[in-house]
Amino acid sequence: MIELRGLSKHYKLSGDVLVKAVDKVDLTVEEGEFAMIIGRSGSGKTTLLSLIGGLTKPTAGSVHVDGVDLWSMSDSEQSRFRAEKIGFVFQIPSLLPTLTVLDNVKLPTMFSRGVDKVGEKALALLEMVGLSEKAHAYPSQLSVGQQKRVALARALMNGPEIVLADEPTSDLDKATELEIMSLIGKVHEEGPRTLVMVTHNLELVNYATRVRTMDNGVLSKSAGQ
């Protein structure tokens, strides 16, 4: 379960201009739920996702994941907790160009023991996203849609209970968009995993179990399914 209470992130610009990227957000995402946050570019949804995942420190408020306050931990404790509990799918896949597709998927567990099992799991995840034949290719040899599928496989490498996805279908044609959403739906259902996705695309709302809208840093009280 994810619980946000009074969560805010404010930035001060030159001339003492205060930007409320996220402002007083209250949100509970139940275990196994697929929550989707819809908003235009600049609405604060990516910042909110970063706050949920512990990548950005809030100005005020709290983030609890499975009852644990993320910001009550030391940096090392938080990093360990995040690595074990949360998988991230970023808008830009950011695959390392000098590593093969397989090694990119293995990155979250690169220093784990049992290398053979790590390799087997990475191959199984590539099979799941339909890219096992690209295991020894390099990111530059993949389309944007294929890179996003690799990023999804990488996010699942540690077996996270929670997946946070930032605009995973951006810059894709309709057919590839549907492929990615079908995979995300599969990830949610087969876990079952708690999934929070942010997007500007209203056409995707039917994939979620609950939908909220965001504008100017404020999350709607109700826009749900």
Stretches found by the model and what they are:
Residues V211-A223:
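H-loop (His-switch) and adjacent beta-strand-loop-beta switch element
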